[in-house]
UniProtKB/Swiss-Prot annotation:
It is found in: Cell membrane. The lineage of its organism: Eukaryota, Metazoa, Chordata, Craniata, Vertebrata. This is Potassium channel subfamily K member 17. The homodimer is mainly inactive at pH range 6.0-7.5 and gated open at pH range 7.5-10.5. The heterodimer with KCNK5 or KCNK16 is gated open at physiological pH range 7-8 and increases current conductance at alkaline pH without apparent saturation. The keyword Ion transport applies. Changing residue 88 to K: 7.3-fold increased current conductance when compared to wild-type. Residues 106-124, 211-230 dip into the membrane without crossing it. K(+) 1 binds at residues 116-117, 221-222. It comes from Homo sapiens (Human). GO terms for cellular component: monoatomic ion channel complex; plasma membrane. Residues 1-20, 149-179, 265-332 are cytoplasmic. It holds the Pfam family Ion_trans_2. The pore-forming domains 1 and 2 assemble to form a single pore in which M2 and M4 transmembrane helices line the central cavity and M1 and M3 face the lipid bilayer. The transmembrane helices are bridged by the selectivity filters 1 and 2 carrying a signature sequence TxTTxGYGD that coordinate the permeant ions. Up to four ions can simultaneously occupy the selectivity filter and at least two elementary charges must translocate across the filter to convert it into the open conformation.
């Protein structure tokens, strides 16, 4: 018996919901920003005010104790100290820290520029360097995205390879995909987020929590600049340190991009934006999940050749664009 297909929901509107999905997404976005604003204001506002009052009090006491200093001269000294810090000097001891505009420091600055991390603790001061930085970033940022995409594709191929081998051994493709995806997630957590803080704790004198905070803020390209490697004036850093951290940033960003891609695929799935308004009937489930054979017996809706169901990490189904269009773009 022929049954008419249900009318598809208009584009930009969640099925069964009167509110457009774009409006719901914008409201959720603004609500999330409001949440962050309130929490950070509550946690950091009073501490910032106390720090400012303490600085002004110390400055006033310095002027009272050393009458030879006048206020303009002290303000000029403070500005010079701030500028010296921006130029790479650390005035906490008699010597400066790593020369950040030396060869290794310049390489690390180039990495932080094209990866858009931008810690903010170091910036070019000459006009020639600023102009070069503009063109360097214009070419380097797209190039970095291409490299990250290629590295992510290689990671996907590795996971797919292990999933196919495990599936052939166990004769259970679903379990193999789940195990391969979970292994990729756990190994990435270990290599890029859990183990590096141990190195940072040893080299920088940070706690493990501070090292983990730096690792995530760096790989997510947030880059506040409150924690930056190579800035401890009492530490002698080996030459390989920043180079190895640069490689960690490159591969870690590719791995984290896969995880963020999975989260985005879950958030952008139609019907999950407004789950309270989504109602699926038994007939809808039948029409989407089963087909009737010649004897009116339900048969499984198997994917076409070249199309694979989505695994637990959302990486098994990704194919080359041409193969996907040829195998999945038309209904059988």
């Amino acid at each position: 018996m022929y049954r008419p297909r249900a009318r598809a929901a208009p584009e930009g509107r969640v099925r069964g919901c009167a509110v457009p999905s774009t409006v719901l997404l914008l409201l959720a976005y603004l609500a999330y920003l409001a949440l962050g604003t309130g929490v950070f204001w509550t946690l950091e506002g009073r501490a910032a005010q106390d720090s400012s009052r303490s600085f002004q009090r110390d400055k006033w006491e310095l002027l009272q104790n050393f009458t030879c200093l006048d206020r303009p001269a002290l303000d000029s000294l403070i500005r010079d100290v701030v500028q010296a810090y921006k130029n790479g000097a650390s005035l906490l001891s008699n010597t400066t820290s790593m020369g950040r505009w030396e060869l290794v420091g310049s390489f690390f600055f180039s990495v932080s520029t094209i990866t858009t991390i931008g810690y903010g603790n170091l910036s070019p001061n000459t006009m020639a360097a600023r102009l070069f930085c503009i063109f360097f970033a214009l070419v380097g940022i797209p190039l970095n995205l291409v490299v990250l995409n290629r590295l992510g594709h290689l990671m996907q191929q590795g996971v797919n390879h292990w999933a196919s081998r495990l599936g052939g051994t166990w004769q259970d493709p679903d379990k193999a995909r789940w195990l391969a995806g979970s292994g990729a997630l756990l190994s990435g957590l270990l290599l890029f987020l859990l183990l590096p803080p141990l190195l940072f704790s040893h080299m920088e004198g940070w706690s493990y929590t501070e090292g983990f905070y730096f690792a995530f803020i760096t790989l997510s390209t947030v880059g506040f600049g409150d924690y930056v490697i190579g800035m401890n004036p009492s530490q002698r850093y080996p030459l390989w340190y920043k180079n190895m951290v640069s490689l960690w940033i490159l591969f870690g960003m590719a791995w984290l991009a896969l995880i963020i891609k999975l989260i985005l695929s879950q958030l952008e799935t139609p019907g999950r934006v407004c789950s309270c308004c989504h109602h699926s009937s038994k007939e809808d489930f039948k029409s989407q999940s089963w087909r009737q054979g010649p004897d009116r017996e339900p048969e499984s809706h198997s994917p076409q050749q070249g199309c694979y169901p989505e695994g637990p990490m959302g990486i098994i189904q990704h194919l080359e664009p041409s193969a996907h269009a040829a195998g999945c773009g038309k209904d059988s």
